[in-house]
């Protein structure tokens, strides 16, 4: 895994190209990541860097976490995220370093992870796009029910994983291969083409795309 940034989803807007085309973008505030811990193979069994984002009052920080941050000399943040990196990259970092938006570049493809908006308890039609039953013609009380969920006498049970009603949303999702349209270094903002999981002010983790296809140069 490559080094990335953790931040917050600001919202959506649009930007215009020089040709006048409108591009929908999501604004991400991702600057000011502080290094709180550097893990190595010798001490932890793997190599990674731990960063924090945002600010938190000292009264809202647990004593174990306060000691952990004091050791790094870092101000308490709202969230802590870990990125797996190689030993060469880890050697370039030290406790207290700040990682900003200059980690990325315009037109770079990234993966963005966030927590989807919770929808509460939902039925199978909303949750899994099941078809509803007939409105009439013999159907009186089965308009929005999922239908049969079982099998015959053998196996005589409902298989695990059967799509049924339940809590919808509020799960971690990753959108891959989003393109960075603009970078506002002064305000530490990334403008990413397309939608990103989660509500406004929700935390997001931004990292270089793992499935990005190499750009092929156009033939002369």
UniProtKB/Swiss-Prot annotation:
Gene Ontology molecular function terms on file: rRNA binding; structural constituent of ribosome
Q: Which organism is it from?
A: Ralstonia nicotianae (strain ATCC BAA-1114 / GMI1000) (Ralstonia solanacearum)
| GO BP terms in the entry | translation
List, alphabetically, the GO terms of the cellular component aspect. Answer: cytosolic large ribosomal subunit
Protein name in UniProt: Large ribosomal subunit protein uL3
Q: Which InterPro entries match?
A: Ribosomal_uL3, Ribosomal_uL3_bac/org-type, Ribosomal_uL3_CS, Transl_B-barrel_sf
Q: Which domain of life is it from?
A: Bacteria
Q: How is it modified after translation?
A: Methylated by PrmB.
């Amino acid at each position: 895994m490559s080094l990335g940034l953790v931040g917050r989803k600001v919202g959506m807007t649009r930007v215009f190209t020089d040709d006048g085309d409108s591009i929908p973008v999501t604004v991400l505030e991702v600057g000011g990541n502080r290094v709180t811990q550097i893990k190595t193979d010798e001490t932890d069994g793997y190599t990674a860097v731990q960063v924090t984002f945002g600010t938190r009052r000292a009264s809202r920080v647990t004593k174990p976490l306060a000691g952990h941050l004091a050791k790094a000399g870092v101000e308490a943040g709202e969230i802590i995220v870990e990125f797996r990196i190689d030993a060469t990259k880890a050697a370039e970092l030290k406790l207290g370093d700040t990682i900003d938006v200059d980690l990325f570049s315009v037109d770079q493809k990234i993966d963005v992870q966030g927590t989807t908006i919770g929808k509460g308890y939902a039925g199978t039609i909303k949750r899994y796009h099941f078809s509803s039953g007939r409105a009439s013609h013999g159907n009186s009380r089965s308009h929005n029910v999922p239908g049969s969920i079982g099998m015959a006498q053998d196996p005589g049970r409902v298989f695990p994983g059967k799509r049924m009603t339940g809590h919808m949303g509020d799960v971690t999702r990753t959108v891959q291969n989003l393109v960075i349209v603009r970078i506002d270094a002064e305000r530490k903002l990334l403008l990413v083409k397309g939608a990103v999981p989660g509500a406004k002010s929700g935390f997001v983790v931004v990292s270089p795309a793992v499935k990005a296809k190499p750009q092929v140069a156009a033939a002369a």
